[in-house]
């Protein structure tokens, strides 16, 4: 299911992913849920829940709510995780190794099909799921010979190498990058980049911890 990027805010997509894991948890003991119940778990308003979901269609039944199983299927379809999406990791340092060795981090709908690094001492080594670490310069050849689409990369190199590595990935056909570095990438508007900065999230968490009103 595809939508025009300008029509949907990043916040809506972020909440959509939260709805999904909440629904999967609630599904263990309930078959249906309404917007009020979902909003309480999400700590938002029922109006916000209805607005978010109505962005993609009319899925609920007035006075009854949502069939949880069906809503999960719909959200997975919207997020494109109702099928397997191939992903490569570029940079097999501590972060890259952590991701490649713990597939649960990726969740449903994603599989690592290639790992790349520029360190000659790492190239050729076989790691998780019998994947061989390849030379980062071989990304284009790998994509061309792989049986299936590979246009998403997890960038886990050191900050100083991030921009150059990202540019090379784009040049070799990568269209979407999960940026695990703390460097703000400057790429074309046709390239999708999502930044994951753990330190920034900890800073955000710490602010709210320090400024949380006592009840």
Kindly give the residue locations of the regions a language model identified.
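HTH-adjacent hinge/linker in prokaryotic transcriptional regulators
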Residues: 32, 36, 41-84
